[in-house]
Amino acid sequence: MWRHVVDKEWMMVRTNYLTASSIKNILPVTETGRKRSQAQIEANMMKIASSFSTEYISDEDCVTTGMAARGHLLEPIAIEEANRVANLGLYHWDDIILVKDLLGWSPDAMSIPQTKKTALYDIKKDGAPCPTSIGEVKSYGMERHMVSVHTDKKDCPERWQLAVGMALLMNCQFANLIFFNPDSTVRLAIKTYSRQDLEEEIKMVEEAEASFKEFLYDENRLGIAKTNDFYEINTKTEKNSDYYMNKFMKEKRMNI
């Protein structure tokens, strides 16, 4: 069985930023091009904002299995094969998120090597990396892999992840979607975008970040004192979910 333990520090840092995987849900259009209502956008913003309240991530939450683990573990192999056949010149990046203000992006690959082994790279503090190109790897199951291979690159929903990367990296001129499935007749497929190709998406990402920032700091929407009779703020000294899980296991109260 495929199994991978994700870096807990990286998982925790991600909860404080608007990432590529969440920003697509607050865009004015869906992945299929349909208009998204303002009510739906705000409902999705509330879901994303809830992650900003995360104080702790359990050890169990850091364990991935099946397709999720498979996809992560195959990333460096996919990049190596893409470099070999298409001369992309990419380096694998892992367990790091690049951030600026509220926007965050975790690169799979860039045209420069990863020199800092840290979960958080703050562009305002450390300066922006200057890759000429970036890469996003997708090691899907057979059906989704083949659908992606046959989808025109201008319609690939994964392009939004590249757009977030380019919004943060102003000097990046090219982005590559790398689809890899070692069991498929089409083992590897690469879709390359120029910055101009993603110009509209980059602009929409920047606008979505600005809208989310306004939503996040609107006390009328997020003021919990107005919606509850009582509430308690968590602290670092409070017992977390790992504590209770271990307690239940010792007391043989877990049905395992």
Protein language model annotation of sequence segments:
Residues M1-L73, I224-I256:
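Charged, glycine-rich intrinsically disordered N-terminal tails and low-complexity linkers that flank
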Residues I41-M45, L74, A78, L162, ...:
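Alpha-helical structural motif
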Residues D59-C62, L73-E80, E158-W160:
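A generic short-segment signal for beta-strand/edge and adjacent turn/coil regions
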Residues M67-L90:
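Acidic-basic catalytic patches of nuclease active cores, encompassing PD-(D/E)XK
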Residues A86-E219, G223-K226:
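Nucleic-acid nuclease catalytic cores
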